[in-house]
Amino acid sequence: MQWFIQDVNIGKNLRSLRERHGYSQYKLVIKLHLMGSSMSRSTYSKIETGTRNIRISDFLALKQIYGVDFSEFFVGLLPEKNTFV
């Protein structure tokens, strides 16, 4: 169950990044296609809702499209630096 929650949260972060950059799902998928991805809009939608996992190649393409650090995808999912004793 914990993994599902993280998938949903990653999906929320992906949606936030997409909206922040002003893309519809359709326009984002077109950009992904230009980078060699075969992802459909419905597949991307499932990734945003946490019902499907993202392929590493698509993840890397999104990083390049958005021009962000990997940590942007994991906001709220990674433990704080000083939480371990």
Question: How would you label these PLM feature ranges?
Answer:
Residues 19, 33-34, 49, 78:
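Residue-level detection of the helix-turn-helix DNA-binding "recognition helix"
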Residues 14, 28-29, 44-47, 73:
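Conserved hydrophobic/aromatic packing and binding residues within compact polymer-binding modules
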Residues 49-61:
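Short, basic-rich loop-to-helix N-cap that marks the start of a DNA-contacting helix
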Residues 12-33:
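Short basic helix-loop element that most often maps to the first helix and adjoining turn
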Residues 24, 35, 40-43, 55, ...:
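Short coil turns linking two alpha-helices in DNA-binding domains
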Residues 2-4, 19-20, 64, 71-85:
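Short, charged recognition helix plus adjacent turn
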